[in-house]
């Protein structure tokens, strides 16, 4: 599935929550995540702005655990990122890990974060608060289907396209001099 994706960095989390409430946005997620990023030993997926991932989520409201197996690949990067995402829920996280490993992929990094997601105008607005050792600042990720919808959402929450970035989180961290475990970042 293709999605348009952009980020707004260094947000005021309480301000965004208040805006979501005032806009009557529907809260669809409040979860803790562990994202295990896989790539080949030579790093070719990440070098081409893609990756394989096993994501384990724990819903903070119900306690339910869900495991997703995903591949992502950037198709283009301009005002926003156009991503191809292929994802499925799996019954057995360990089996998902073994499948990736059997394809020659190796675990590159394991990233913990809290994510709070809202739906508004057929778009998803996500507050991401990562483990500080990975990314020390909160940000918004907005996923939608058109530039028009993106501009509309941004206006509703007090931002413009100029406030956004299509850079990957790894590019943003590298720009800020924040080193990570993954080769080349």
What are these regions (language model features)?
Residues 13, 147-150:
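Short, well-ordered alpha-helical microsegments
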Residues 151-162:
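Long, well-ordered alpha-helical scaffolding segments within enzyme catalytic domains
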């Amino acid at each position: 599935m293709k999605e348009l994706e952009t980020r707004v960095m260094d947000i005021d989390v309480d301000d965004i929550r208040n805006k979501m409430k005032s806009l009557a946005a529907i809260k669809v997620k409040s979860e803790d995540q562990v994202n295990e990023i896989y790539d080949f030993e030579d790093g070719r997926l990440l070098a081409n702005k893609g990756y394989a991932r096993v994501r384990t989520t724990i819903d903070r409201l119900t306690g339910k655990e869900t495991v997703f197996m995903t591949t992502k690949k950037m198709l283009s990067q301009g005002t926003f990122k156009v991503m191809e995402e292929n994802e499925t829920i799996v019954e057995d996280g360990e089996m998902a890990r073994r499948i990736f490993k059997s394809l020659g992929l190796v675990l590159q990094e394991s990233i913990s974060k809290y994510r709070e997601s809202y739906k508004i105008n057929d778009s998803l607005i996500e507050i991401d608060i990562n483990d500080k050792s990975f990314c020390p600042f909160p940000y918004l990720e907005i996923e939608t289907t058109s530039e028009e919808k993106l501009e509309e959402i941004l206006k509703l929450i007090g931002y413009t396209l100029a406030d956004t970035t299509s850079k990957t989180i790894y590019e943003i961290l590298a720009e800020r001099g924040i080193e990570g475990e993954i080769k080349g970042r």
